Amino acid sequence: MSPKKILLVAHDVTLAHLGRPLQLAGYLHAAGHDVTLAASSDSARFLYNFPGRTHTLAPTGKARFIENLAKGRPVFDFETLKRFAEEDEKLLAHYRPDVVIGDFRISLSASARRQQVPYATITNAYWSPDLAPRFIVPDLPMVRFLG
């Protein structure tokens, strides 16, 4: 397979949303692909050893995201999503990747379609209906008492 130009976009409102694309980007770079990883400046300290190219996104509004999530409100308002989409489209137009892979960048699916760039997303397995989790009950006295 010939090397591909791959853009990964980490919407790093939590460390997991950076860690997954960072790990995947490292594997793809080691496999010989031209990899760019985009994340906010809040994540710069985690990217200094990344061997590929990096791109700094506008701040993601972590504090507001966490507050909205905790209060059961929509995590992003329309204006924020619009701003993300505009940034996505500029990013895609600039790098023109063969594929873009996002982690919690909600706007990226629509932006990639508008720019005609194939899109994939990184999702935790526990969000899949195909996962049948096996819960192990710890062997504690309270468990024996309650059953």
Language-model regions: role of each:
Residues 3, 12, 30-80:
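Conserved nucleotide-sugar phosphate-binding/catalytic loop shared by glycosyltransferases and other
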Residues 5-7:
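Residues that mark the start of a beta-strand
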Residues 10-22:
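A short, glycine/small-residue-rich beta-strand->loop->alpha-helix junction that serves as a flexible
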Residues 25, 29, 113:
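Gly/Ala-rich phosphate-binding loop of Rossmann-like dinucleotide-binding domains
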Residues 38, 55, 101, 120-122:
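Hydrophobic/aromatic beta-strand patches that form the interior of the parallel beta-sheet core
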Residues 43, 100-115:
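An aromatic- and histidine-rich active-site surface loop
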Residues 68-107:
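Conserved nucleotide-sugar donor-binding subdomain of glycosyltransferases
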Residues 118-147:
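Active-site-proximal region of nucleotide-activated glycan assembly enzymes
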